[in-house]
Amino acid sequence: MKKPIIGITLDEEKSKTYSKYPWYAARKNYSESIDLAGGTSIFLPHSSENINQYLNLIDGLVITGGDFDINPEIYGKEISSKFVKLKKERTFFEFEITKKAVDMNLPLLGICGGQQLLNVVLGGTLIQHIPDKIQSNINHEQENPRDQPSHVVKIKKSSNLYKITKSEEMFVNSAHHQSVDNLGKGLKVNSFTEDGVIEGIENPNQKFCIGVQWHPEFLIDDKDLEIFKALVESSRKN
């Protein structure tokens, strides 16, 4: 049986830790999670002119996270936090491919910053720095390693995420200082933390359109793999 091909977006760096020239990067556990879920993956360079070819090639899409933020101007706001860091080229590419993927009803999973991007693509806004808006005992930028849990998320029983995980709670990691604020068109909250931060979103009218604020590719909770399995299975039917 042919395995579904899942496209995974890359991060880009200009630091000289690897090369003195700009380079792409992605953690292995993104593709390893797709492999474990029964799919195969390819990484997508930030070539906007090739977006249509990418979308004709792949059966599903993962928008990954990274140590950067979406320019608030894209969702009609000014920068209000000194902690906002931008990557213009990556954001432009991911915005365009996500918009087209949604229009095509292509199965899509947004992870961390990928969830935030999905929300912005659909007209939503973001909290630019959580501590500026929400007082909380939860450290959403955990100090312990990312392969360890940080906190619990509550999952709504009415959501597709609940149908996938069959659970009302998950232990997750946490590596973000921004979060979804106003929801984009067609999106619903599927999970949240006790302090009210939105941890997951979805469009129930799409074949598979889910965003999570944590990094399920670390497979901390056994239900993380179920998310990737659901993406791959939806992509198999694409």
Where are these regions (language model features)?
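Active-site-proximal beta-strand elements of phosphoester/diester hydrolases
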Residues: I210-Q213
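Conserved G/P- and acidic residue-centered "switch" motifs that form tight phosphate/ATP-binding loops
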Residues: C112
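N-terminal beta1-alpha1 cap of cysteine-dependent amidohydrolase-like domains
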Residues: M1-L109, V120, D132-I164, F171, ...
